[in-house]
């Protein structure tokens, strides 16, 4: 087997593990079967989930067999948060999310060959258990004292309190490991470091019930340079679903990675070899303005999630927006996603003066300021220099019949979207 342990260590993907020597030996002598779980708490995964998805992919590439669990049962309960109780979602909604998340994860893995991946749903074994079976076969092996010591539980007890439903979540997740060990020979659980308590509880349940030693590996929770949570922008989470976060916005998120963190992100999210990442790291130090590391990161992750064609298209769109190529060549869906990230005016008709639109979108401080920018030669509409301060939107060849890109100078952008006819 490939020495995937050293690779995971170098990439900074090991925050915690059970007995390191035993796990390393199991990985080297494998193949072993491992699982990673995702709860369907929304219609899409976000970029934070990619750490688990891509780590699962790395293990599969090393010859190990992945089980991908999307929790149709645990998603109905909810892992306790330190702050407040989770919203209980309708079972039909959760079932739809299970299907959606399975579809998002599947393209990252191989479902054929000796290390073929398998999708599993914990509702399959949880819904058939009676309450008596659950309490005797699972609950009997858990100490309430230890459950009360869990950080999320203790914080909730000190503030808003916690329901028995969420308090019992750890039993459900632990039973997943037991069931997957029995049904599929699973001997490794992969998860985020925030799940470490749940993961090790599953290891302990397997040891108590089946008298077998199994393994656990937790990846770190990535952060920004200031220590805040990775994967959030001012507009919210960065989703994998292109309808929730456009491919353009997705690419921009990675392109804006901080210099201090870009190498960490390349290690975690890229499949480039060590030599290439180290070279990109050197370039980031020696010539940070070129942003070569960020460009490499943005292209690769966008291609992984949305496909190579989309990655190339959004890069072409970015170049066109700043005057580097033809705006008319941009696909409408990509253009719409790009313009959604800009200040936008939606005039009721096309008789409005372009100078007014520069003021309305904030590219100029006022109408007089917009006229001054036009007079100085610093105003562009669809990459064509605007020379007439009295020109209206009717004088513009709209992109895809309804869009215009306004630019002041080299970098300040805004958009115009003419409403569709009713």
UniProtKB/Swiss-Prot annotation:
Upper classification of the organism: Bacteria, Bacillati, Actinomycetota, Actinomycetes, Kineosporiales
Spans through the membrane: none
Similarity comment text for this entry: Belongs to the class-I aminoacyl-tRNA synthetase family. TyrS type 1 subfamily.
Binding residues annotated for ATP, in chain numbering: 232
Motif ('HIGH' region): 40-49
Natural source organism: Kineococcus radiotolerans (strain ATCC BAA-149 / DSM 14245 / SRS30216)
UniProt EC number: 6.1.1.1
Catalytic activity: tRNA(Tyr) + L-tyrosine + ATP = L-tyrosyl-tRNA(Tyr) + AMP + diphosphate + H(+)
Protein name: Tyrosine--tRNA ligase
Annotated compartments: Cytoplasm
Pfam families (UniProt xref): SYY_C-terminal, tRNA-synt_1b
PANTHER family, per the entry: TYROSINE--TRNA LIGASE, MITOCHONDRIAL (PTHR11766:SF0), TYROSYL-TRNA SYNTHETASE (PTHR11766)
GO terms classed as biological process: tyrosyl-tRNA aminoacylation
Keyword set, alphabetical order: Aminoacyl-tRNA synthetase, ATP-binding, Cytoplasm, Ligase, Nucleotide-binding, Protein biosynthesis, RNA-binding
Subunit note: Homodimer.
UniProt keyword annotation of ATP-binding present: yes
Motif ('KMSKS' region): 229-233
GO molecular function, one term: ATP binding
